[in-house]
């Protein structure tokens, strides 16, 4: 499926903050910000899919073929060094398994969004769920001015392709 760019006009057509989500090479979807609770954002799609993010990181999903839930996600996703978190995977089910993750030091980079070049920190997260031999790399692009995540590529479940998310905030 071809990708499409969110233009200033498309951005202005939405009343609320939203994310543009793409699973692997599939079509994109727009999810609207429905709620914010203690820093966790709940994004809802037209098909009732829900993605919950904390500082741009997916911490829970609902309505997908395979879902995840990080039981007590770390507030500061950018801590360097190893962090262990309890994780539930659904379809197939795996409960309270420990996932190890570590962040690399940020690298200066830039991305293009709404027709503008944005300076970002590119942050690489390595993860490993040893019990099932699943590991990988997630990427976060953090705006150097606002501190917000502008874009991410996340692997959240061994049965799902990489999820690419563009974040569009309205205040």
Where are these regions (language model features)?
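Acidic, serine/threonine-rich low-complexity disordered tracts
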Residues: 1-53, 60, 78-171
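Acidic/charged, solvent-exposed loop-and-adjacent secondary-structure segments enriched in E/D, K/R, S/T
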Residues: 63, 67-72, 115
